[in-house]
Amino acid sequence: MLVWFAEYLLKYNTAFNVVSYISFRSIMALLTAMAIGLWIGPKVINRLQILKFGQEVRNDGPESHFKKRGTPTMGGIMILVSIGVSSLLWADLRNPYVWFTLFVLFGYGIVGFVDDYWKIARKNTDGLVARWKYFWLSFIAFIAAFSMYAMGKDTAATQLVVPFFKEVMPQLGLFYIILAYFVIVGTSNAVNLTDGLDGLAIVPTIMVTAAFALIAWATGNIHAAEYLYIPYIRHSGELAIMCTAIVGAGLGFLWYNTYPAQVFMGDVGSLSLGGALGVIAVLVRQELLLLVMGGVFVVEALSVILQVGSYKLRQKRIFRMAPIHHHFELKGWPEPRVIVRFWIITLVLVLVGLVTLKLR
């Protein structure tokens, strides 16, 4: 929005040209989202406490989690508000990639909100009926995937980028829609599964999204794209603003979510953040790189799949409890140790992922 005002005021003072730079707006989007999160955090937490929107805890989980029962949840609302206001202020709203991201972010946020509300209303951890939850997640993902494909059909925007190979960029055709669907829905659910400990999901999300801010800038800059042998995609540079808005909102939320947490993001936060991260990875054509940098999310999701599959086939469990962070807790690891070690692993994976951009 501010881009429009700056363009109008440019004829009066050339200093307003600074707003045209993605780097400037990215920094401002981060600071704005973080400031909003820090400001509204206490208000949101207080309101959630008044409404008795407290966390429900599984009875078969680690005993250390019982003290978390009643901690305000649905704090993802403050994340969505922070991202929404910041991106509307600093992103160029004429850019369709901005709207694709916002559509998935808030669409998944609504699904997560309903899921959280049902958990609170029923006083259990089941939430929204699974088939309806995945129906709406799939419906939103398919709309986004089809729209993105229609806009970028048979261009660099629908090529598959393979790490380490600069010449291997096949056109995906209609398979683009299927791949985009699985990346968006899969990432959303993986982040949701990771969100089981204080700060465990938000910090890896911040790290991976910060890396994608750099990737988005490079993909939208023809010279940087040529240097890194990645496809140049015209509209993708603006996604850097969306990424830094997510980073800023995440930092603002982390202020209140760090151990011991004053608030949990709930599904309204984890589903929306995961969905946004997935759609950004699709738009900059780095789905495979997301698997590397978001390795913690991948392992968390795989641990659940393997646990369920093993129990159905063999009536035996592989882990003491899934997702895998609970397995380490039941082995005797203190919660902060699990959290920080997963953060460290994510940092290493993000750095490895960024290095692969040059190793082609």
From Swiss-Prot:
Function: Catalyzes the initial step of the lipid cycle reactions in the biosynthesis of the cell wall peptidoglycan: transfers peptidoglycan precursor phospho-MurNAc-pentapeptide from UDP-MurNAc-pentapeptide onto the lipid carrier undecaprenyl phosphate, yielding undecaprenyl-pyrophosphoryl-MurNAc-pentapeptide, known as lipid I.
Species annotation: Haemophilus ducreyi (strain 35000HP / ATCC 700724)
Superkingdom, taxonomy of origin: Bacteria
Membrane-spanning ranges: 26-46, 73-93, 98-118, 132-152, 168-188, 199-219, 236-256, 263-283, 288-308, 338-358
Cofactor: Mg(2+)
Disulfide-bond pairs as recorded: none
Keyword tags: Cell cycle, Cell division, Cell inner membrane, Cell membrane, Cell shape, Cell wall biogenesis/degradation, Magnesium, Membrane, Metal-binding, Peptidoglycan synthesis, Transferase, Transmembrane, Transmembrane helix
E.C. numbers: 2.7.8.13
Name by which UniProt lists this protein: Phospho-N-acetylmuramoyl-pentapeptide-transferase
Pathway: Cell wall biogenesis; peptidoglycan biosynthesis
Catalytic activity of the protein: UDP-N-acetyl-alpha-D-muramoyl-L-alanyl-gamma-D-glutamyl-meso-2,6-diaminopimeloyl-D-alanyl-D-alanine + di-trans,octa-cis-undecaprenyl phosphate = di-trans,octa-cis-undecaprenyl diphospho-N-acetyl-alpha-D-muramoyl-L-alanyl-D-glutamyl-meso-2,6-diaminopimeloyl-D-alanyl-D-alanine + UMP
Family: Belongs to the glycosyltransferase 4 family. MraY subfamily.
Cellular location(s): Cell inner membrane
A Pfam family the protein falls into: Glycos_transf_4
The keyword Oxidoreductase belongs to this UniProt entry's keyword annotation: no
NCBIfam families xref list: mraY (TIGR00445)
PROSITE patterns hit by this protein: MRAY_1, MRAY_2
GO molecular function, one term: metal ion binding
Biological process per Gene Ontology, one example term: regulation of cell shape
